[in-house]
From Swiss-Prot:
It catalyses: 5-(methylsulfanyl)-D-ribulose 1-phosphate = 5-methylsulfanyl-2,3-dioxopentyl phosphate + H2O. This is Methylthioribulose-1-phosphate dehydratase. Keywords: Amino-acid biosynthesis, Lyase, Metal-binding, Methionine biosynthesis, Zinc. InterPro entries: Aldolase_II/adducin_N, Aldolase_II/adducin_N_sf, MethylthioRu-1-P_deHdtase_MtnB. It comes from Pseudomonas syringae pv. tomato (strain ATCC BAA-871 / DC3000). The gene is mtnB.
Length: 204
């Protein structure tokens, strides 16, 4: 795809995710792989439901802006680490939904486990509900390099991992294409809502 086409994918993703309430106001950040050594990311501080072509920028995979005057998200390193360690990844989405934020704060453990949900099959490589989808939860940290360093061992040890939560913050997920990442966002949000409702019903 051309840069213009990839930028449009980011713009359309922003409108969709904002419309679902998963990327309110200027929260969240999105990216696509531009080349083997570059990514396109949302510019810092932009309303995700109102993105335009000037609201994306190219960075190298060290997270440095390649476009003077444009500032990438503070969390750029969390995107580029995925492009570096997983060559098959073509898009990364970070959202700030209510369910992801609340569930990550309510969960004392360092991970969530989902099993016996038919929608688990929305994740790449999952063929049956008789399986587990494990979602790690990392404590929030304003030092993004340190946070990325905390995430890396999990990514290395769990190649099947499709996403993770940052406590009190939001969700990261990724896929070979933007459509794959968006599909997984929807699946995660369904599972998060189910888990919260189960906890309410069961008084957990």
């Amino acid at each position: 795809m051309s840069r213009e086409q990839l930028s449009q994918e980011i713009i359309e993703a922003g409108r969709f995710l904002y419309g679902r309430g998963w990327s309110p106001a200027t929260s969240s950040n999105y990216s696509v792989r531009l080349s083997a050594s570059e990514a396109l990311l949302t510019v810092s501080g932009k309303h995700k439901g109102q993105l335009g072509p000037d609201d994306v920028l190219a960075t190298d995979l060290a997270g440095n802006s390649l476009e003077p005057g444009k500032k990438p998200s503070a969390e750029t390193l969390l995107h580029t680490q995925l492009y570096l360690c997983r060559p098959q990844v073509g898009a990364v989405l970070h959202t700030h939904s209510v369910n992801a934020t609340v569930l990550s704060r309510l969960t004392a453990s360092d991970h969530l486990v989902f099993e016996d949900y038919e929608l688990q099959k929305a994740f790449n490589g999952v063929l049956t509900h008789e399986s587990q989808v494990v979602v790690p939860i990392f404590d929030n940290d304003q030092d993004i390099a340190r946070l990325a360093a905390n995430v890396q061992p999990w990514l290395d040890a769990h190649p099947e991992c499709a996403g993770y939560l940052i406590r009190g913050h939001g969700l990261y997920t990724w896929g070979a294409r933007m459509s794959d990442a968006l599909r997984q966002i929807e699946a995660f949000e369904f599972l998060f809502e189910c888990e919260l409702k189960m906890r309410t019903v069961m008084n957990r």
